[in-house]
């Protein structure tokens, strides 16, 4: 995991924790989770799998494919995309403070799980131990 990737994920998470509006917390937490996915994909995805037939592939599906032990996390965060898209479209009241806080907490747990599993070395050979989180 590169320091830049990790720094970007942590920065998004810090932004989520400091944001006043629930919609801003939700968006920043979702971005933090996507940045964590980027870290895993950088280490696990075979070259050329980020794009399929010229179109980008869904990050959550790719995560489940390259790190099956993270499939539940992938499904969870994929399910949050509808609200994220609605917020981006202007429906800022669609998420409650509780939902935003929960997503921040979950994004933080996801980041810590990946940090512990990957550390600063590649993990192509080693699955991520989700039982230890």
What are these regions (language model features)?
Residues 1-133:
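Terminal alpha-helical segments
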């Amino acid at each position: 995991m590169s320091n830049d990737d990790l720094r970007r994920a942590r920065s998004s998470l810090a932004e989520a924790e400091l944001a006043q509006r629930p919609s801003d917390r939700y968006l920043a937490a979702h971005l933090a989770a996507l940045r964590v996915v980027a870290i895993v994909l950088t280490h696990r995805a075979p070259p050329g799998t980020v794009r399929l037939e010229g179109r980008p592939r869904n990050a959550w599906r790719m995560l489940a494919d390259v790190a099956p032990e993270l499939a539940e996390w992938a499904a969870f965060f994929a399910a949050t995309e509808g609200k994220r898209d609605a917020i981006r479209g202007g429906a800022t009241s669609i998420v409650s403070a509780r939902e935003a806080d929960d997503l921040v907490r979950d994004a933080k747990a996801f980041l810590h799980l990946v940090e512990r599993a990957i550390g600063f070395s590649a993990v192509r050979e080693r699955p991520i131990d989700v039982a230890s989180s």
